[in-house]
Amino acid sequence: MNQYKRLLSNTFIFAVGTFSSKILVILMLRFYTGVLTQDEMGVADLIIKTTSILYPVVSLSIGQAVIRYGLERRRRKPDVFTIGLLTVACGFLISLPFNPLLKLVHYNTSAGAAGSLLDYRILIYVYVLTSCTQNVCGQFIRAIGYVRLYAIDGIFRTFMTIVLNILYLKVFRWNIYGYVASIICSDALSTVCLFMIARLWKYFRLRRINFYLWRSMLLYALPLVPDAILVYIIGFSDQAFLASMQNTSVSAIYSIAYRVPTLIALVASIFIDAWQLSMVNSNTKE
């Protein structure tokens, strides 16, 4: 019975954190369409979707291994956390020489101008790095028992994204850069807060790295990379084709319409997160 109570409790906590943040984002759509043109919305969303595909490639989906091995009592928590951050750092450095591939994602604007995401490579790479780092920290605090902090962090990131969106888009008029920079800054602030509140610096140790554990975590995480990529490609491919064959204005309309159905998929993901946490905890105790 305690297992079911824990599962329901975790599901409720994740639901509060996830749905509150997603609803706030949907409510902000009117603001985005008011301060950004359809072309700017289309390009900005292409950047977001491209980053979502690069994220599992650069991080090697190590965040999933962090929570999987971090929940096991026999594992040393500092080893798991350190390996998670080192994997992100190594993946990021290895990916840097491949930035010219961003030129393959090109688009046309409604005014007839053409461009590619290579023009935004610095913005994209910074976004990937902050997103991967934040994910490792977020998954690790779940593993060490900060479940409520994990949910609150989701709300905090969304709130900061909205505040920074208003500042960067309405006040500074940074347009595409402001839209993406607000997400980057919110992820960075989230990482700093998690480090301070959960004292994550205590778990980062470069001495005596457990390479056997590193290998085990990679063997667990690597098969998850194709699955993560394909999930994002389903939504990205349609938008990329529209931006290339039509224009970014058309892809922006498609992107806005696509956000509402994604809420349905969130219901399943919330339960899966809670179920994974409860099951691993149960097996560990046994």
Task: Specify the residue positions occupied by each region the protein language model found.
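Alpha-helical transmembrane segments of multi-pass membrane proteins
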Residues: 53, 57, 93, 97, ...
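Interhelical loop/hinge segments that connect adjacent transmembrane helices in multipass membrane
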Residues: 1-7, 116, 176-180, 192-235, ...
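Signature of the first transmembrane helix
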Residues: 6-63, 92, 96-99, 127, ...
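Alpha-helical transmembrane segments of multi-pass membrane transporters/permeases
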Residues: 8-20, 74, 78-82, 126, ...
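Helix-loop junctions and terminal segments of transmembrane helices
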Residues: 58-74, 143, 261-286
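Hydrophobic alpha-helical transmembrane segments
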Residues: 118, 122, 152-200, 220
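C-terminal transmembrane helix end/exit motif
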Residues: 63-66, 139-143, 147, 167-172, ...
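Alpha-helical transmembrane segments of multi-pass membrane transport and lipid-handling proteins
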Residues: 19, 82-112, 268
